[in-house]
Amino acid sequence: MRSLKLFIAASKDTPDLPGFFQVKYGGEFAARKFLPHLTNFKHAPMLCTKTCYGFRQKLPLDFSEDIAGIMLFPSVLPELIDDAEAYLKEPLPSHDIFIAVGVHPDILIELIKQVPDAGCKAVIVPREDPTWLDASLVEKLKSLCETKGLEYAFPRPFCSLSKGKFKYINNFIDQFKVGKPNYRLVTDEEGNITDVVVTHSSPCG
């Protein structure tokens, strides 16, 4: 199977504070953890310890070529957005998996409506911030995905993402080796642990 391509949408990581009738959606997880992890911290080695960074460089963990595009939105926005499409300034890149992190719900809904036209097969919305999406909105988003013929996952948190009934999401977990951490212990004939092989790590690294 060919490599899956990712389209990632997130809020910008800024110190801006919301004013009246505004709300802030954090971009910290995407900017400081998930994206550096996908690119093996090559653009932000300071976010990883020296020992960790040195070890990671020995492994094929740079998936930069599999990121079709990244779309960043202002972290502070109106509480309600009447015309969410106006915030989509550029055409969506062709991709297989859409991942949204900390995006304004009105913009997220508009993105899910549009991603099928860009070839998207699955939507992953990790809920690192428990206040971001409430249960009723998650059900609405799942229904929208089903209407659009999209696979979906709303892990809370991202490191709880596990394989299930959806083929493309299962392939995403295998290709990018992220989700619920999984490892294998290697022992010698006497039962002593000689090595630990990590097959899947948490998306934050």
Where are these regions (language model features)?
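General beta-strand structural signal in soluble alpha/beta enzymes
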Residues: 125, 152-156
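Rossmann-fold NAD(P)-binding glycine/threonine-rich loop
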Residues: 132-149
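Structured beta-strand/loop patches that form or line metal/cofactor-binding pockets in enzymes
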Residues: 155-190, 194
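Short, thiol/selenol-centered motifs that function as redox-active sites or metal-ligating centers
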Residues: 198-205
